[in-house]
A protein has these predicted regions:
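Ribosome-associated RNA-binding proteins
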Residues: 1-175
């Protein structure tokens, strides 16, 4: 049995197969498979245990360790948040970034007339400041998927990528 201490200012609520972690910046919900992991919340501690089924011992032990690491990162992120920076780089055509609701648009990439667009996942906040794009959120998966979506729409289809290196690139991650 593994136990995790819940930091001050963080709250954990257990439903059937999901654990809701709430902090000062917001909340995130972590789902788990009760076939492999059993979770109990008692006061300011979370107890994790592997399945007693002998056929699933190895798999459930690995699942418990993974879920424990996920919960540690989640409890830190609901308190401090996650921020990533991306940089807008272009050499040929000056592109502009526009955000409308949960949509992210890149206009004039490679001189294209139709803007490229993608979605912003979950409660992630995206801001454009000059040549930098700041992505902030509470859930590390939502922030990561938003970055992946932005990188995916910047792919230069039909162009020599050694020459056409225009796009939005991940600059640094602030923890």
């Amino acid at each position: 049995m593994y136990e995790l201490n819940i930091p001050l200012g963080v709250r954990a609520e257990l439903n059937v197969a999901e654990l809701k972690i709430t902090g000062k910046l917001g909340y995130t919900v972590k789902r788990f498979n009760p076939k492999y992991v059993s979770v109990k919340v008692n006061g300011n501690k979370i107890f994790l245990d592997a399945s007693p089924n002998k056929k699933l011992t190895k798999k459930s032990t690995l699942a418990v360790h993974s879920f424990e690491a996920e919960l540690r990162a989640t409890m830190e992120s609901v308190e401090k948040g996650i921020e990533k920076k991306m940089k807008i780089l272009y050499a040929h055509f000056p592109m502009t970034i526009e955000i409308k609701g949960t949509k992210f648009f890149i206009k004039n990439m490679f001189g294209e007339r139709v803007p490229r667009s993608t979605s912003i996942i979950g409660n992630t906040k995206v801001e454009v400041k000059g040549q930098e794009v700041h992505i902030r959120g509470v859930d590390q998966y939502d922030v990561g998927q938003t970055i992946a979506n932005i990188r995916k729409i910047c792919y230069a289809r039909g162009y020599d990528t050694r020459v056409f290196q225009d796009g939005v690139y991940l600059e640094e991650a602030e923890e």
